[in-house]
């Protein structure tokens, strides 16, 4: 907004359906005319009377222009706020004329005698960034990556580590038991190669004299009967 602009707010009815056009650069612009008619109450006749109508052309640019073309139509009562501009032009006959137009900042329906269903349209510059590859999309991808990474590292890794610990501890313990068993076998081997234990009392060889006391070969080969 430049210094010295004449700000204006107009309430009126749309005379004709808005026209949507596009500039060579691709910018959308919508034009429509409104009639703002003052009304006053005549106490003598006890009726409302219409004054002289003010006709103004309204120009709307970019995304708002597309929304206006899709939402508004002839006869609707609207509220327009913007800057009052004077535009001069020359007719085909060479006559110079001037018109007053409103460069609209905001356009909306008047809800005094009507209802409106407002639907928000996604903004082209931010919708792709937010949902496609911007903040929301990137944040969502990052969260999924963290969740998957954390799940893989924590659960899978921890589960594998536990299995590894169980296998090592169990196998190691089992191996230790085997080693202990082998140690017992060694003891048995020692038992086999060590001094003989005492024979039972009912052993027939128990009453034989010790070896080397006499008999054939210096030892008793047969028990006495």
From Swiss-Prot:
GO MF, one annotated term: single-stranded DNA binding
Keywords: DNA-binding
Bias kind Low complexity: ranges: 164-188
SUPFAM superfamilies: Nucleic acid-binding proteins
Biological process according to GO: DNA replication
InterPro entries the record matches: NA-bd_OB-fold, Primosome_PriB/ssb, ssDNA-bd
GO cellular component: nucleoid
CDD domains assigned: SSB_OBF
Gly residues bias: start-end ranges: 125-148
Positions of region (Disordered): 111-225
Segments forming domain SSB: 3-111
Quaternary data: Homotetramer.
Name of the featured protein: Single-stranded DNA-binding protein
Protein source organism: Corynebacterium glutamicum (strain ATCC 13032 / DSM 20300 / JCM 1318 / BCRC 11384 / CCUG 27702 / LMG 3730 / NBRC 12168 / NCIMB 10025 / NRRL B-2784 / 534)
